[in-house]
Amino acid sequence: MMIDIDHVSFQYSGAERENLQNFNLQIEKGECVVLTGESGCGKTCVTRLINTLIPHFYEGEMSGTVLIDGVDTRTIQPHDLSDKIGSVFQNPRSQFFSLDTDSEIVFGMENKGMPYQVMLDRYQQTIRELHIEKLKDRNLFDLSGGQKQTIAFASVYALNPDIFVLDEPSSNLDPEAIQELRRLLLLIKAQGKTIIVSEHRLYFLNGIADRIVLMEHGKLKQSWSASDFALLSTEQIKALGLRSYT
């Protein structure tokens, strides 16, 4: 089991109610799980459990356990899992540490003290495998929203984590950029990476997701395999408050 969230309840400091209530979710290695539901349902809270921002960055009251590849996240610091987990946030600018694309792609590797040749090899591999030659040596502030998202993804990809966590990655993207995001997700899916995506838009994840998890008021309301979810009619999906899957 790659990820095991066991009976977790969590309430942010200052929140009026629990943000997660007795939440359970198990994710196998190589599985792509999509968390969906209305804003405020707890999707982002789950992603923060997985990338260990909860409990180490966001304060609050937590019960239950979160195991990442068998390791209890309360017993280690986020940087100890940086080889295993990579995160792409809703607003890529929030995770940039550099002014140009090349520096941003290698930043995580530099921060880990990797040897120069290893960094160079991984940088070149990232550029080649993601097909982003046109984004080399660019000013980050000259890029479109979609291009910024691609660089944020590339900086994570260069570290070669086992788990990719993406929090509403399509929210600020146009249709063309969403298709580029889909291409990147298909790539890491084919590599056997474990993928967790918090999303309102679902159509671009058709053919990538293995499981769709609907959340409501901090609880897991319903879960489908991708094949079962694809059988739902447009009316059924709309009645659940979800967007089209096709």
Label every model-predicted segment.
Residues Q117-L135:
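Conserved ABC ATPase "signature" region
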Residues T65-D80:
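ABC ATPase NBD Q-loop/coupling interface
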Residues E199-H200:
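H-loop/switch region of ABC-family ATPase nucleotide-binding domains
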Residues N139-L143, Q147:
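Conserved ABC ATPase signature
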